[in-house]
Amino acid sequence: MALTTKAMNSFLVAAALSTCATAVNVAVDGIIVGRFVSPDALSAVNLYSPYAQTLSIILLLLLYPASSQAAYFIGERNREKAGSYISTSLLSILVAGVLLSAAAFVFTDSYVNMICYDDDGAIALYLHTYFRIVGSGTLLFLLAQFFCEIVNIDGRPSLGARAIAISVLCNIAFDILLTAHLGLGVAGSAMATLIANTVTVVFLSCSHIFTKACSFTIRIFHQFSVSALKSILKLGVNMSVTSVFSAVFIFVVNFSVQKCCDEDGLFALSIGMIVFNICVNLAMGVGRSVVSVGGFLKGLRDWLGYRHVVTRSIRVTLLIGFAVSIAVMSGARLLVRTFGADTPEMVAYCTDALRVFIWIVPSSMLVTLMMFIYQAMMNLRLIPVPTVAFSIAEIAALLAWPYFMPSETLWYAFPLSALLSIGIIYLVSEIVRHGDNTISGLTHIPGHTDDEDVEQLHLSIPANKDDMYLSLKSIRAFLDSQDISGGLGKKLVLCLEEIFLNINEYAGLMGKGHCYDVIIRMERDGILSVVKDDGRPFNPLAVEEKKRGLGLEILLGICKHVDYQNMYGQNLLILQFSYE
């Protein structure tokens, strides 16, 4: 369990960074244009968000369902099928990206007229410039997200995090250069975003995706599968419906604030939505860690580890949500000034508005996470419920509020309706559960599965010889209690002893505070043993035959089915023994 937590943390950071990359880049763009162009330029950058939300429909439809299923097949050690899902997803995203890039360029005027309350003002002019450039680079954005996701599910989250860090730094550097020093205004900010996405695509392509380091081969035409596409779309349609509602929600938010709260209100909303988008994307990153790490654990039939991942993800999400809300509430005045508020009246108004609006964050993060938890469980009925409930509650509140309450109090509608949506989600989940006590409320995770009916042993062992030999005694006692031949139990213990010794010697664990996790499952047709460690990459199966020691020769002679993977920064060795 210790290494399950470590894998979760490792993936969570990388996934959160990759999902937040766009929101962080928008925040950087906003600060730069707000300070070096005008506050109206910041509002224009924020008005790009409905289109950005629309792009998430493509990711939810074609990328995330494919990655969750690929993660499951990687867990089952079926790399060919994982490659088929990824290749199918990539070809679909390439087609969608080309079409959307062309459409964004051609229909820029239509978008500006639709989204701006005053389509002849300064905000509309800034938005026209920003949208035409960034929208034309839609394909680059989709590819950057695709490559980050694939690197993460292939067990290299640190590489994805590195790519995102480089991308954000490039965006900051080119934002300052093009916008502040060369005076290109919002056009410079938009070009900096395209450059950052290009850097991400090139870096990940050259360092992992199309190299031998990738554990599966991507051949978009050879491995394209109609059946895989149908499976992706079946799951993706339920998820993408949620993004449609989210896009409508963002449109209504911008329209309502423009109508009720004038330019200062739109400026305050722009800052609030930047923080909101970063936090929601953080929750998406946590959710993707549930889908990928959890999907991998489900493939291994490790339900104990899966429940641990889900519980931890909920705690982390709520902690981040409340921490951000408290921090923004405390530093709202400084935040408003940082984004370029230039009069005392504007600072005072935006500070008060932001302190109320920000409490939408904890509820919205939990709502986002719940969608991914339902996706990981393949619960098609509940996948759309969280975001649809949230969007409908917010839209209804924003449209009705001015008729019953003063317009200046509109900001209170955001957190109150977000809380209402949590209640709606819980109510719907209880209706779907229909009194079934075998699954948990809200998350719908099974309290018990058929996979857990088999006898199994889970151990976390400190990487030292004393604890190693004590654990071998525990394993031997467990095997002796099972209805198997004594010889088979001795063979498994002998193999595990050899593996532990090799891990300590070659993976650099001994005396350094490391550990390894061991799972032994008494399955119907044999014994499955999984050994995980967090040392440096070490594959005993890759040792040349003439260089193998006696212990390794014995291990490979006794156990005919041995598989090695390096996933999420950990060595994973899987041994299968037949009862025959």
Where are these regions (language model features)?
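Short alpha-helical transmembrane segments in multi-pass integral membrane proteins
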Residues: M1-A15, A70-G137, H181-G236, G294-W359, ...
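Transmembrane helical elements of multi-pass membrane transporters/channels
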Residues: S10-D29, I133, A144, S167, ...
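Helix-terminus/linker motif at the lipid-water interface of multi-pass membrane proteins
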Residues: V24-S43, V112-G121, L177-L184, V244-I274, ...
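Small-residue-rich hydrophobic transmembrane alpha-helices
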Residues: L42-A102, A144-I153, P157, A268-I326, ...
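Short runs within selected transmembrane alpha-helices of multi-pass transporters and secretion channels
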Residues: L63-S67, I133-N152, G160-N171, S189-L204, ...
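Flexible, glycine-/charge-rich segments associated with ATP-binding catalytic modules
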Residues: G441-L459, K560-E580
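Conserved short strand/loop->alpha-helix "switch" segment adjacent to the catalytic nucleotide/phosphoryl-transfer site
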Residues: R476-E497
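Glycine-rich/acidic phosphate-handling loop/turn and adjacent ATP-lid/helix
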Residues: I527-L552
